[in-house]
């Protein structure tokens, strides 16, 4: 069992013309963004479930190692990958991220200082590079959470088509589980959704806890 405390302060939106303030509004809810989580000292092989402020947020969490089924081509390290959603509309997930080396764990996305030894989903050794039969896609979760609605953002769902923008490679998301690796750690990204619709939960600004429970 592990957890991460996330602190998001209240914000004000202000528009000024010369020295005169024309609007000033309290922003009571958290803005949409991705947050990286890196939990350690967990039980290897355990599937855990994420909660934020006591609410199940499994659908908004993406593991660093995404389980995929390749459909064409081979992904390349450093390229951007985008999602093709299963459905249209405001409820459809949108995802845009950078591909890290397949066994990357810590360090630069293309030059890891620590690597994964095994695939946490099947216990097999992880290859040193991507190929046409790769079963995981390693996402650079650091850049994904680097800034509020920056270049990279979003979340995915099972069945989503992922497309490499440089390689043209395609794969479908075969499963989305948070499983502790053999080194007792788990890395992933939590997406705080847009608050413009009641379809997604809203989280008040302030001190909120992100927890993982088995």
What are these regions (language model features)?
Residues 1-214:
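Extracytoplasmic/secretory-pathway segments with low complexity and glycosylation-like composition
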């Amino acid at each position: 069992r592990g957890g991460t405390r996330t602190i998001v302060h209240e914000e004000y939106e202000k528009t000024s013309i010369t020295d005169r303030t024309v609007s000033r509004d309290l922003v009571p809810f958290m803005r949409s963004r991705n947050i990286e989580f890196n939990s350690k000292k967990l039980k290897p092989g355990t599937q855990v479930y994420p909660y934020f402020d006591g609410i199940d947020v499994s659908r908004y969490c993406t593991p660093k190692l995404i389980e995929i089924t390749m459909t064409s081509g081979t992904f390349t390290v450093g390229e951007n990958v985008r999602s093709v959603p299963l459905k249209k509309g405001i409820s459809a997930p949108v995802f845009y991220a950078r591909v890290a080396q397949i066994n990357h764990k810590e360090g630069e996305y293309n030059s890891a200082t620590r690597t994964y030894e095994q695939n946490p989903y099947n216990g097999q050794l992880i290859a040193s590079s991507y190929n046409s039969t790769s079963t995981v896609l390693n996402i650079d979760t650091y850049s994904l959470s680097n800034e509020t609605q920056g270049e990279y953002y979003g979340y995915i769902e099972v069945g989503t088509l992922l497309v490499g923008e440089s390689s043209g490679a395609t794969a479908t998301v075969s499963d989305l589980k948070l499983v502790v690796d053999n080194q007792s750690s788990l890395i992933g990204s939590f997406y705080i959704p847009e608050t413009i619709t009641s379809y997604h939960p809203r989280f008040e600004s302030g001190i909120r806890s992100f927890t993982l429970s088995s």
